[in-house]
């Protein structure tokens, strides 16, 4: 899907470069990203960061490109604290993304999208070249079929009890993105993210073993998440990490650093150390367009950070020489 989307984006820029009608050119270069959750804002950030490069390559005026991020909710990434959501919104606006929050998509088709603000009854018809749907996660096909029989919520997520069993069929266990479970004392269901998948899988495996062998005892699912991280392009991110009862926000540099640490941690488990070296080379040493939270300073094509000790030494020598000249 990512490759198809990338080729589509290049294709609309190629068409726009040849288009002589300004109105049609701007339609081709209009992007609507529906959904301002984790996927939506990350997509908007990546696209906004990629647009200047595409404009240079295809000789397109940046002013003709429009990126809209649409969501029915009042703020971006509502799973984050409001302070971090505000940072995300500020960064997206700085990158040229137009936020359309509290806005519902009522209809869309080839070359257009119709949106309606919750504060107004008027429906706005906008021309567009691309609509990217990032408004929520759909359950897998097999889960969707199961949801026709089993109690479910939110796009086919199956309701489960404390032991991750279906509410009506105790021999059916559901985990990860496919389950709908609200922990005790919480008001919202567990998020559809990696930590929830891993932790629920471990609990379900033990409970299935108990159901088969009838030895030991069932384990209640008590999720303990260590935080979330959102990257807005390759140079900026926000994160909230810590322990369940002690969470804190990280500044952008540390947030991006934690992102790479997490990626490396999972690569070691899945692909081994060889992949780590490839990842480090790609993300820190071969950096194109300064697309990294360390800028281009670590690039092997321009390793300017290696010059820092030399510059410090040279500055110290000049200071020492000037001091001697002053004394003489």
Predicted features by range, described:
Residues 44, 137-139, 235:
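Short glycine-rich anion-binding loops that position phosphate/pyrophosphate groups of nucleotides
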Residues 196, 200-294:
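C-terminal, flexible cofactor-proximal segment of oxidoreductases
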Residues 1-39, 46-53:
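Glycine-rich dinucleotide-binding loop and its adjacent helix/turn
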Residues 49-162:
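A Rossmann-like FAD-binding core segment of flavoenzymes
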Residues 30, 64-66, 171:
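Residues at the starts of beta-strands that form the adenosine-phosphate
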Residues 282-328:
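Alpha-helical membrane-anchoring segments
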């Amino acid at each position: 899907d990512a490759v198809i989307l990338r080729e589509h984006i290049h294709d609309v820029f190629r068409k726009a470069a040849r288009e002589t009608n300004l109105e049609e050119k701007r339609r081709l270069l209009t992007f609507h990203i529906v959904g301002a959750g984790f996927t939506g804002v990350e997509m908007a950030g990546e696209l906004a960061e990629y647009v200047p490069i595409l404009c240079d390559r295809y000789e397109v005026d940046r002013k003709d490109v429009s990126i809209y991020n649409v969501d029915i909710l009042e703020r971006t990434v509502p799973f984050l604290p409001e302070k971090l959501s505000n940072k995300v919104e500020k960064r997206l606006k700085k990158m040229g993304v137009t936020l359309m929050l509290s806005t519902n998509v009522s209809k869309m088709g080839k070359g257009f999208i119709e949106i309606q603000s919750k504060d107004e009854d008027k429906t706005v018809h906008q021309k567009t070249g691309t609509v990217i749907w990032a408004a929520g996660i759909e359950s897998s096909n097999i889960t969707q079929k199961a949801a026709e029989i089993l109690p479910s919520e939110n796009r086919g997520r199956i309701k489960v009890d404390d032991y991750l069993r279906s509410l009506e069929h105790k021999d059916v266990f559901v985990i990860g993105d496919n389950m709908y479970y609200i922990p005790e004392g919480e008001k919202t269901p567990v998020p559809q993210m990696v930590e929830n998948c891993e932790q629920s899988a471990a609990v379900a495996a033990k409970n299935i073993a108990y159901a088969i062998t009838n030895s030991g005892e069932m384990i209640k699912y008590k999720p303990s998440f260590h935080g979330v991280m959102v990257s807005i392009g390759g140079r900026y991110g926000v994160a909230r990490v810590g322990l369940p009862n002690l969470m804190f926000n990280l500044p952008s540099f540390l947030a991006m650093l934690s992102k790479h640490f997490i990626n490396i941690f999972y690569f070691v488990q899945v692909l081994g150390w060889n992949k780590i070296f490839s990842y480090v080379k790609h993300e820190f040493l071969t950096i194109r367009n300064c697309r990294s939270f360390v800028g281009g300073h670590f690039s092997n094509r321009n390793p300017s950070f290696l010059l820092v000790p030399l510059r410090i030494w040279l500055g110290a020598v000049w200071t020492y020489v000037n001091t001697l000249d002053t004394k003489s």
